[in-house]
Structure formats: C-alpha cells, structure tokens
Amino acid sequence: MKVLILGSGVIGVTSAYYLAGAGHDVTVVDRQPEPALETSFANAGEVSPGYSSPWAGPGVPVKAVKWLLMKHGPLVIRPKLDPVMWVWLLKMLRNCTSARYAVNKSRMIPIAEYSRDCLRDLRRDIGIQYDERSQGTLQLFRHQAQLDGTGEDIAVLKQYGVPFEVLGREGCIAVEPALAGVKEKFAGGLRLPQDETGDCHMFTQALAKHAQALGVRFMFNTGIDRIVTDGARVSGVVTSAGVLQADAYVLALGSWSSRLVAPLGISLPVYPVKGYSITVPIKDASGAPESTVMDESYKVAITRLGNRIRVGGTAEISGFSSKLYDARRATLDHSLTDLFPRGGDLSKATFWSGLRPMTPDGPPVIGPTQYANLHLNTGHGTLGWTMSCGSGRVLADMLSGKKPEVDVSALTVDRYAHRFG
C-alpha cells in the first residue's frame, strides 16, 4: 500500500520506519530541509514512561496561580485574542479532577512503556546510536515538604508496576555524584531506574537513514497546503510540489495538525505549548549529571547527552510564537548553575524553543478518523520522544490490518465527542 506521511519529526519518522518494515511504499513530506528540525530538535532528552502523566490534574489550577507569580515559574500564559486558546484551556480545566486524571493517565502509561520497549528493540536490531543512556531519572526535591508529598505519585507508580526508589540526600548523591557539592539545596528524590535518556534529534536523523534504506522517500523543503477529500476518503494533499496522492495518509504534524484537519470537519484539540531548552558543552565531567535530574521546584530537566548538558523546561501558552524570551533562558540557567555549578560552560550555550503539541486531557491522538484512509499520530505533548517508537509501530500495525500489541482504542480522536475533550 502507498502511504503518505505528513511530518518528519520523531513521530513521522518512526511511523515511516515501521510502515516500510511492514512492506508499504512510504513517502514523507515536510517543509524543513531535514528530519527533526522543529519540536524534535532540542527537547529535554528524556525517555520517561514513569513520568507519563497528564498536565491536567487535581490541584493544578491552584498551583498554576502560584507558578504564574514565581520569578522562575514553570508556567507562562501570554493572553491572545484567540478563541481556540481559551477553549483549549477550558477543556484542560475540565480534566483537572481526580477521576479524569486517573482515566487519562491509564491511557498514557501503556503506550509509553510499550514505546520504551520498542526503542530497546531498535537498539538491539539495528544498533542505532543517539547519545543514549539507561541509568534512570531522578526527580529532585528541594524541600522536605515536596518529598513528603509524593504519596499519591508513589501510589500511582505502584498501581502500574513502575519500579521506583525514594532517596534521601545521600541516596541522590550515590546516583548523581555531582550533587555532593550542593547537598544543602535539596532534601531527597524519587528515582525511576527504568527510564532512559537520549538525543531525539540524533535518533530521528539516524532512523530516517534506516528508513531510506528500506525504501522510504523523503520530500523535504515541501510546504503542505491542504488536504483534499472525495466523499468519505482523502483523495490527495496539495503541496508546493503539486498534489500528492496515496492509498493512505498519516498526519504527524504536531501542533499544526489541528489547522490542517479543521476544514475537513475533524475537531482535534491539539494546541501548541512552547518549551525552551539550552544545550551546554560540558566543562567538568565530574560536575555534570550522569543522567536526568528533574528540578521539581522549577519543573526543569537537566540531562547529560554525550559531551553536552541539555536543560529543558517551561510551559508557555502563547499560540504559535517561537520567540525566545530572556526570562525563560534565565530560569534554565538558574537551575543548572544552582545544582551543577561546575558542569557546563554557559558562555557557549545555545538557546532554543519548540512547540509541544498538547491535548487538553494528556494522551496523544493515534488512529483512524471519519475518513477511511486518514490516520492521526499527533498530540504527544512533552512525551513525543518517550512515546515515539510505540506510536509509530502501533500506527503501522493499524494500517497493515494487524492488532496492535498494546491497546490504544481509547486514543482515537473520537474521545473528544464528549464534554471532557
């Protein structure tokens, strides 16, 4: 079957790889000159099934007010006269209940864990390299009250069988020795030993080459204008290279997915939430993190990627703006220098922002639409890297007529037919 994939981020490329492996004739279209140059370019670097949770949860509205007032707060809202933004925020607030949180998290954990297993299979099968490490992740609590308040999180981890360790100061230092010099700045941590780290951009570029070896064709520097339909089917995609036609179509355009399907009558509440990162050359290896340390107070992840440190964080709701703000850079700088003062050379850091494709309830949107030959693979939010391989494989199984190895029936766009979407 001839399949056209729109988007060459990590979701589009994993979808292409698995579809080609299943014997399909695959073409990937993207406006960029290479794969993974937008949201997949410089994310925090975590492959963290254990942290696969909805942003919408009980207590979040109250916390949001506090975050908005903090100097280095993790949340920024830049109000716009955009009804889509406000409708999306309202839908998110409707999901901030214990009952909805439990349902939404139960939909996220299986695909995240399956995806990590698929990633491990890829490493074994094709030897792909991407500055990967399998040393777990550490959620660091600066205050004892934060550590004491982990009961609900631990209960959820137990419920889903996710291995964890609650660590005091010395336990944190044992897994992250560079923290020894700042031990007065934290009370303890929660470690997830099965989580991994790696460079998403490096991975996606490498997997694209493997996909090409399987026959995948990439059409870069190609703008995507609109989708054309004929009754209950998609008949083509209008691009800067002309109208492209296939037997099946996969939409993996991240935050831009909603705009493309809205004219088709598909209500897809995926909205961009901007994240920022800095990438810092390691100055002193003994002063750098071994894996990922999540600074819970500022919601900042500090990750070692080869000879670099990636520092990522902030949730900025400001539409499709990619503008870089110095205040957001200051938050990332502060978290790094406060916890790993000897680790990186900030004078040589690069500053970046990307638009995370967020759903109001948390889980991604994977599966068929009202058009028989149009499938969605989008809305992964902060977990695109974590969920990428599993999402791509599930999508390939669907189009190949196979039953996916993990149940994703609750991840289709149809779930937004009820009021919580």
From Swiss-Prot:
Whether Flavoprotein counts among this entry's keywords is yes
Provide the reaction this enzyme catalyses. a D-alpha-amino acid + A + H2O = a 2-oxocarboxylate + AH2 + NH4(+)
Q: Which residues form the signal peptide?
A: none
- One GO CC term on file: cytoplasm
What does the similarity note say? Answer: Belongs to the DadA oxidoreductase family.
Q: Which organism is it from?
A: Bradyrhizobium diazoefficiens (strain JCM 10833 / BCRC 13528 / IAM 13628 / NBRC 14792 / USDA 110)
- What InterPro entries does this protein's entry cite? DadA (IPR023080), FAD-dep_OxRdtase (IPR006076), FAD/NAD-bd_sf (IPR036188), K_uptake_TrkA (IPR006036)
Which cysteines link up through disulfide bonds?
none
Any one GO biological process = D-alanine catabolic process
Gene symbol of the encoding locus = dadA
Gene Ontology MF terms: D-amino-acid dehydrogenase activity; potassium ion transmembrane transporter activity
Identify the NCBIfam families for this entry: PRK00711.1
Which keywords accompany this UniProt record? FAD, Flavoprotein, Oxidoreductase
Q: Which residues bind FAD?
A: 3-17
EC id:
1.4.99.-
The cofactors named for this UniProt entry are: FAD
The protein's name is D-amino acid dehydrogenase
Task: Answer whether the UniProt record assigns the keyword Oxidoreductase to this protein.
Answer: yes
Describe its function.
Oxidative deamination of D-amino acids.
> What top-level class of enzyme does the UniProt entry assign?
oxidoreductase
**Which PANTHER family does the UniProt record give?**
D-AMINO ACID DEHYDROGENASE, SARCOSINE DEHYDROGENASE-RELATED
Q: Which Pfam families match?
A: DAO (PF01266)
Superkingdom field: Bacteria
- SUPFAM superfamilies linked: FAD-linked reductases, C-terminal domain, FAD/NAD(P)-binding domain
